[in-house]
Structures are given as structure tokens and as C-alpha cells.
């Protein structure tokens, strides 16, 4: 299924070898990010990993969680996991990226962080944005990851995206991001939408108004 892209005028050049890395770095540095104040939530961090696709443009890594996982199995997700005692969010995401998809990433490849997102299932997730050149060791850990996808960044600028859906269970609207022939929901969709608006476009945006689908609340 072909993607329908919106008018890309005003969108930063997504050539991987261009100025995009500096644009993202500058925009994240200027963003006044917020952390959750709810100490009862489990802390986690995930990686929004910017990589080069087969056309020389920038993409990001999306995974499909393993079928055998106890929580949120077979859902689309960003690589990451729960922050262990004594770890920083950055240390967690570097460890989880290596464990889940085989890439060894260093702290100097981190461009910055976005807002923490509180989930209905009791987590507070920090998205960490990274720039990775070497994908030679990219490989799914069979117990945790079913599939790995490299998604063109331009997918975030589709004319049919984002979609907002009203539900009876909440006053907030559920976010859907059409990516390829799939619909990605919050929390992953919330993190990617803020990445688009803040890191790529330099706009102001929070994520606390974004609802998850009811099936993700558990």
C-alpha cells in the first residue's frame, strides 16, 4: 500500500547525510521537556533511533513485540524497557537496544530526550532520541522481538495522519498514526508524534492530552 504524503514544504530535509542531525539536536535542546511527577508509576525509556534507509534518507526503527511476551505481546513498539535500579534512562535505553535488536550504541549518539508519557498500564516512558550510523549488527532477539522495521521519517508527514478517535471510556481522543499499512497507537504513536512536532519541526507540543486505545490500558 502506497503512503499518501502531505505537502512537505517547510519540512526539514530528511537526507541522512544532510543537516537533519543538527536540526534534531538543536530542536531537542530548545525543548523544555517535562517529567512525570507520579512516583507510583514504573519508569521506562525507549529509543527513537534515527537511521539511514536504503534510499539514503532518514528513517527510524520500529519493532513488533514478541508473541510470547507477558505484557503487550505482538504490539508495535520502540526498542526499550523498564529502568532498573541505579540506572539512568539513557543507560536503560542503550542496554535495551542492544538486548532487543543487537545494536551497540554509545552515549555520544544520544541527541536528547522528549517528555515522559504516562500510560494507563502504570508506566512513565521517556523517549530518548539517538542517531545511529552502523546497522551491521541489527538482529531481532527472538524472545522479545518478532519483527524489525525501518520506517521512512516522511511517513510521519502523511496527509491522512494523525487520526483522532473518540471513545466512550475517556474524554480524551485516541491517537492513531497510519504508518505503511498499519495503525500505530499510543503510547508509541504519542512519542512519535511529539518527535515529529518537536524534534523535526521545532514546534511546541505536549503528550498529556493523548489517549491510548482501551485494549492498551491493561
Regions found by a protein language model. Give the residues of each.
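N-terminal leader/linker segments that precede catalytic domains of diphosphate-processing enzymes
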Residues: 1-77, 81-99, 103-136, 175-218
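NUDIX/MutT-family hydrolases
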Residues: 140-179, 214
